[in-house]
Amino acid sequence: MRKIASHYALINGALERGIVVEVDDHGTITDITRHDTIDNLASVEFYPGILIPGMINAHCHLELSYLRGAIAEATGFAGFAREIGRVRGNYTNEERIHAASVADSEMWHEGVEAVCDIANDTLIMPVKERSKIEYHTLFEAFGLLTEKADAQFAMAAQYRHAGATPHSTYSLQDGVFREIANSGSEPLSIHMLESDDETALYNKYGSLWDWYSRMGWECDFLHYGSPAQRIASSVPADRPTILVHGCKATAKDVALLNDHFHRPPVWVLCPESNRYISGITPPISMLREMGATIAIGTDSLASARHISMVKNIQLLDDITLTNALTYATLNGAKALGIADRKGSIEV
């Protein structure tokens, strides 16, 4: 049994003084007590700062950790996608596994206890299974030539806390997108409005449209009119859904999706990644005004210098510390459907 205290503790979305948290040998909170002063309490471990729940990284690509520093900044959205394809074949499996293990350790030592991790294969699953962190792995279907999600479903069936997800609203044809959206119970995690190019694609212009046209790739989903309309038309209203980035989301997009879903989607912001790729920032003030549920992710070391929740918190503008900490803890747990056991300090 341990008794732990700090200058402040995050309790029910507020910073409180005089809090002592008791935990058992398994790390489960057994009691929370309040005191006028904790200076003279016996057997209390005191840590300067703020006592918060374990952080929840609501969007990560751990498998891309081997690309730390491999892709230049400011490539732009389409340029970054092309660079990933160009460099990812230059590394051995051993290098990929080692890099994932290092990044996993970095997250744990920073205070991350659960991660929504996006995967394309099972290579680093042993790293996640050995980890102290609880990983929820979503195997993404990606590519306009992808016709079925059988591989993603088969991989997910092998593991606990695993499912399939569409990569985005711009990289997957209609049939397979709908197939995934209507199968399984794990949350979907969809890259959403990371750049203006996504909306432009639906109007047949911009860098994505130009790239696809050069490659001879056709899109059978442009009739939806916009990324938000595609999600509202394709994803069941009762499916837990995470929308990642949202840098170019509008109030109209948020309102449409709030109206569609029984439980509004969680918008996961990855500000360091957005600055690294395109120099843009997510519209956090608009999301807050629209009553959106906001969580935080690190994205990958291909698109950021750090795999750090703290760094991403520091990059969020115009919000209070308590809001930022709530995004990094409780709201991430809500995104993963684990708020009954993670993301808050309570018995």
Where in the sequence are the language-model features?
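N-terminal metal-binding scaffold of metallo-dependent hydrolase/deaminase domains
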Residues: 1-39
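Active-site gating loops and adjacent loop-to-helix segments of metal-dependent hydrolytic enzymes
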Residues: 66-98, 136-139, 195-239, 260-261, ...
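Glycine-enriched alpha-helix->loop->beta-strand junction motifs that scaffold or abut catalytic
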Residues: 132-135, 183-187, 236-241, 256-268, ...
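His/Asp/Glu-enriched, well-ordered alpha-helical/loop segment
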Residues: 233-237, 280-347
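Histidine/acidic-residue-rich, glycine-tolerant segments that coordinate divalent metal ions
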Residues: 112-233, 246, 250-252, 276-279
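Histidine-centered catalytic micro-motifs
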Residues: 53-65, 187-196
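Alpha-helical scaffold segments that flank or form the walls of functional sites
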Residues: 22, 50-51, 66-131, 152-159
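Active-site metal-binding motif and surrounding structural segment of the metallo-beta-lactamase
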Residues: 35-52, 183
